[in-house]
């Protein structure tokens, strides 16, 4: 079946598919009784092109040493040649009989063969090119595997000579490959991994120098240095393994995430396969000692298998875990025997055979477990609270639809996240979140069922879920303000402790204390980042993925940084030790800053500043307590915290100003930030005067005044970022109409006649109420829920549900997206149809969808050009740029499917349908994301573009007319 993971393949298949679609249309017209035209000329052109393609293919086979290519390509060449021959025969038959049925059958079979054979040839060649790149990656992995046995500078020099050209080649070839990929996500992963490999390589070499230096001196710290080296080599290996995994991918699901359970399982399974060879080599060597590369590979296989057992289906979990435990016990015994010099004993050899058999069985069980999760098709819960809330609300609004327990799982995860966040909150906030969690669980139990009470409980549950989400996000803003208030001091104090001269009193104790402080800060920061990834206000999948990745990196990097600090303490004169410490410090600082920036981006800046204000007031109260208690140091500490919060507010203000291209907004924000920056030294100066003369009431009064001015400047910054909104219109209902018995005329009006009604005027009809807004033409197909065996219609309905909340009047993006949803619903019918004209209409509908997708992309790009918010604009461009590629692929796949109509049921037909379904789902998801991004971008439009602004008007429900 056609795949389109590279731009080259897509550019070749698109014109071929266009020609085939014309032949399919001619075939349909002939079924209507029309004579087929003379096809000899176009068929001759196709035959010549096929002959040339076959010649190039055979030359490639003869010159290649790729066994898989030499095995797979001949069958693809044979298919293309056979298809070309069918076209020639059909052309000859039609020339003599333009109405020939057998000729038309050969024509459609030949068309199908040309398209699929060409695709197979291209894929065959492309896979061969990928294998070459993977071979280079594996060569680097082999070098990294021996990093642990490099013990002299001569060996290190040779290691570097061997590694450098391989690394350069990997960087060059993977860099060229990522530019060829059509799936943007795959390209981004390759770029990110390459950047990490490039950064880590010199740090690894430096760590190896440190290790060799310590070993040659027979000094202290060899274990820490070896651990540093192994950690860096393992990180580089992981990045290369991820490159290898992504290079082999040919499809992408827009709904998937790097955080999805199935994606994680596939990564773990891939890692097991890659480590198996090293593990078997270790088993085969009776002299291999404990702690070597091979044993570590074996242990990694067991760890990965155990993690898979925790993520797979229950029926697959126990056998994997049991087998992993058996291998662990046997490996421990084998290590002890080899350590005692009994590696060749009958017992050891028996253990080796047993471990090898079980490892093979474990690999097979892991493969089955991953397939089991894939086939089960259990829909993933979203990775953010916003996404989980949408899944839960969808279930609560339509409990009659079987969602496989997705909505209930989403609610459970929201509650679980709420309880996790509550643990780190102060008393009153903790109690509030825990109470909301309890109420959600209670209402969830009451909502089970279909009676009136259950429906009422479902409504209340929806409301409580929104309240819980808001409470979690408020708590997270609190954590971000507190935990990222000062990210530099723990690292700075740790560095100062490391650099203390030898012989300084309490040097070791000070180092231990500052190391513990650094570890505690890292733990807090990474925990907060994980919570923000799940519960942040932005709901951005990419930010969530990077936050989780950064948190894991900080967790693993902190112990290595502390070890590097200890080595530097032990060897103050070593240039290599100092350079290594600086390398890891830079890695750590960059990762923490990235975490802080992403947490800021995931938080509403106005909420952040408001929470910072509240914390400033708390610290100000503590300052007042310090003044009353005559504690100057407490005054200094709390003033420092206020200053840190002010600097964070200034940083957020600068980020918002740099992110905006609206001159009015940036001018107002920068002016407010400058005033705040000028106010800070005055407050700090007044606080110093108080600290030096804690009993002076005049100094205390001056400090209070300067703090209040500072607080006012903070509010001005907040107002500049998010101007205060006017009070909402009253939403209360009018007073109820009293009963007739309660009505009476007052004495004042008793004598007065009622007013006379106006005389009727001819020609004037009474004014009609405004008609309800109904841009629902052709939308009847979405009024009922599609069946589970209609995946394309389900995807189309999902897009329609997203866009129908907006009026398409004065909003071309919404109009185009609605048109796409309706066309996709029609495509869903045509895929299952085999009526006369269905092939022609299938191709025409796919073409219309592709044209509408180009309209959505064009309009989104126009909107992005007008958007003043750089982050929103980048996000909009990223999501909309995927659409044309998917639209082109839809045309090609629809042509393939059209050649299958009338021959349903074959494996090829099923595969074509599956690919078409996946493509349709990706297209609908991309358009849905584009609509959401476009709505956000419309809020931040240049002031000189207001006349062309898209109108985002929510459609009124019928009861508001």
Swiss-Prot record:
Q: Please list the residues that carry the modification Phosphothreonine.
A: 774
Q: Which PANTHER family match?
A: VINCULIN
- Here the segments flagged for biased composition (Pro residues) are 723-738
Q: GO annotations under biological process?
A: cell adhesion
Q: Which residue intervals correspond to the sequence repeats?
A: 258-362, 371-470
Q: What is this protein called?
A: Vinculin
Family membership: Belongs to the vinculin/alpha-catenin family.
Arranged from A to Z, the UniProt key words for this protein are: Actin-binding, Cell adhesion, Cell junction, Cell membrane, Cytoplasm, Cytoskeleton, Membrane, Phosphoprotein, Repeat
Looking up Gene3D superfamilies in the UniProt record yields: Alpha-catenin/vinculin-like, Vinculin, Vh2 four-helix bundle
Molecular function via GO: actin filament binding; alpha-catenin binding; beta-catenin binding; structural molecule activity
* Places the protein is found: Cytoplasm, Cytoskeleton; Cell junction, Adherens junction; Cell membrane; Cell junction
GO cellular component terms?
A: actin cytoskeleton; adherens junction; cell-cell contact zone; cytoplasm; cytoplasmic side of apical plasma membrane; cytoskeleton; focal adhesion; plasma membrane
Q: Which gene encodes it?
A: Vinc
Q: Where is this region: Disordered?
A: 720-778
- What does this gene product do? Involved in cell adhesion. May be involved in the attachment of the actin-based microfilaments to the plasma membrane.
């Amino acid at each position: 079946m056609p795949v389109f993971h590279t731009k080259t393949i897509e550019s070749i298949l698109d014109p071929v598919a266009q020609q085939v679609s014309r032949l399919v249309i001619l075939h349909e017209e002939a079924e209507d009784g029309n004579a087929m035209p003379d096809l000899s000329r176009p068929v001759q052109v196709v035959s010549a092109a096929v002959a040339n393609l076959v010649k190039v293919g055979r030359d490639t086979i003869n010159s290649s040493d790729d066994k898989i290519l030499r095995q797979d390509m001949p069958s693809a060449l044979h298919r293309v040649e056979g298809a070309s021959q069918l076209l020639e025969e059909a052309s000859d038959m039609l020339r003599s009989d333009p109405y020939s049925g057998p000729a038309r059958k050969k024509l459609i079979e030949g068309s199908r063969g040309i398209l699929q054979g060409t695709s197979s040839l291209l894929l065959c060649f492309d896979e061969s090119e990928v294998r070459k790149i993977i071979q280079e990656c594996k060569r680097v992995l082999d070098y990294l595997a021996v990093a642990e046995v490099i013990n002299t500078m001569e060996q290190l020099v040779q290691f570097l000579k061997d590694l450098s050209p391989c690394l350069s080649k990997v960087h060059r070839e993977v860099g060229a490959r990522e530019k060829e990929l059509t799936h943007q996500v795959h390209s981004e992963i390759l770029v990110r991994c390459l950047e990490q490999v490039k950064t880590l390589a010199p740090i690894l070499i430096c760590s190896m120098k440190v290790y060799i230096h310590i070993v040659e001196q027979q000094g202290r710290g060899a274990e820490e240095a070896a651990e540093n080296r192994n950690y860096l080599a393992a990180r580089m290996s992981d990045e290369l393994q991820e490159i290898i995994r992504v290079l082999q991918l040919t499809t992408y699901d827009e709904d998937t995430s790097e955080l999805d359970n199935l994606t994680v399982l596939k990564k773990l399974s891939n890692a097991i396969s890659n480590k198996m060879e090293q593990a078997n080599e270790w088993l085969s060597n009776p002299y291999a000692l404990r702690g070597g590369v091979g044993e570590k590979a074996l242990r990694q296989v067991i760890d990965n298998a155990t993690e898979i057992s925790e993520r797979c289906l229950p029926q697959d979990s126990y056998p994997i875990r049991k087998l992993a435990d058996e291998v662990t016990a046997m490996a421990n015994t084998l290590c002890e025997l080899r350590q005692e010099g009994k590696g060749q004993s009958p017992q050891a050899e028996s253990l080796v055979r047993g471990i090898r058999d079980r490892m093979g069985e474990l690999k097979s069980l892991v493969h089955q477990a991953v397939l089991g999760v894939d086939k089960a098709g259990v829909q993933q819960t979203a990775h953010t609270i916003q996404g989980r809330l949408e899944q839960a609300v969808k279930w609560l609004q339509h409990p009659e639809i079987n969602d496989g327990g997705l909505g209930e799982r989403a609610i459970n995860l929201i509650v679980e996240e709420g309880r996790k966040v509550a643990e780190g909150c102060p008393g009153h906030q903790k109690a509030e979140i825990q109470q909301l969690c309890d109420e959600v669980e209670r209402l969830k139990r009451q909502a089970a069922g279909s009676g009136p009470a259950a429906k009422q409980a479902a409504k209340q549950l929806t409301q409580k879920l929104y309240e819980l989400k808001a409470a979690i996000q408020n708590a997270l803003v609190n954590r971000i303000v507190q935990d990222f208030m000062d990210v530099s001091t723990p690292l700075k104090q740790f560095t100062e402790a490391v650099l203390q001269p030898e012989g300084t009193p309490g040097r070791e104790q000070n180092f231990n204390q500052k190391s513990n402080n650094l570890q505690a800060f890292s733990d807090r920061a990474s925990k907060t980042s994980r919570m923000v990834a799940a519960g942040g206000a932005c709901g951005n999948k990419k930010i969530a993925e990077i936050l989780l990745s950064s948190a894991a990196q900080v967790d693993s990097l902190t112990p290595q940084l502390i070890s590097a600090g200890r080595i530097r303490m032990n060897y103050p004169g070593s240039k290599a030790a100092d350079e290594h410490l600086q390398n890891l410090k830079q890695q750590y600082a960059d990762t923490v800053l990235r975490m802080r920036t992403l947490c800021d981006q995931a938080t509403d800046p106005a909420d952040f500043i408001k929470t910072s204000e509240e914390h400033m007031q708390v610290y100000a109260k503590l300052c007042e307590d310090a003044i009353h208690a005559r504690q100057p140091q407490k005054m200094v500490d709390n003033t420092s915290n206020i200053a840190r919060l002010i600097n964070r507010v200034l940083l957020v203000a600068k980020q918002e100003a740099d992110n905006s291209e609206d001159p009015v907004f940036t001018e107002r924000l920068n002016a407010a930030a400058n005033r705040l920056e000028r106010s800070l030294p005055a407050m700090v100066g007044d606080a110093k005067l108080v600290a030096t003369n804690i009993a002076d009431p005049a100094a205390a009064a001056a400090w209070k005044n300067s703090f209040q001015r500072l607080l006012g400047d903070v509010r001005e910054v907040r107002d500049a970022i998010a101007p205060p909104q006017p009070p909402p219109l009253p939403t209360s209902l009018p007073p109820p109409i009293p009963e007739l018995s309660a009505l009476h005329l007052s004495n004042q009006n008793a004598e007065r006649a009622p007013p006379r009604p106006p005389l009727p005027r001819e020609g004037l009809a009474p004014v009609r109420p405004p008609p309800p807004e109904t841009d629902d033409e052709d939308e009847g197909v979405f009024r009922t829920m599609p069946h589970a065996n209609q995946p394309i219609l389900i995807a189309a309905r999902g897009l329609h549900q997203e866009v129908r909340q907006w009026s398409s009047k004065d909003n071309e993006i919404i109009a185009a997206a609605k048109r796409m949803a309706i066309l996709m619903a029609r495509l869903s019918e045509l895929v299952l149809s085999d009526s006369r004209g269905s092939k022609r209409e299938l191709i025409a509908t796919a073409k219309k969808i592709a044209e509408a997708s180009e309209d959505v992309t064009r309009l989104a790009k126009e909107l992005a050009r007008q958007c003043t918010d750089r982050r929103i604009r980048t996000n909009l461009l990223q999501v909309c740029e995927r659409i044309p590629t998917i639209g082109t692929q839809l045309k090609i796949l629809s042509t393939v499917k059209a050649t299958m109509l009338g021959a349903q049921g074959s494996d090829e037909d099923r595969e074509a349908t599956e690919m078409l379904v996946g493509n349709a789902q990706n297209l609908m998801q991309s358009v849905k994301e584009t609509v959401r991004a476009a709505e956000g971008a419309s809020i931040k439009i240049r002031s000189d573009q207001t006349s062309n602004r898209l109108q985002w008007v929510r459609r009124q429900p019928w009861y508001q007319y």
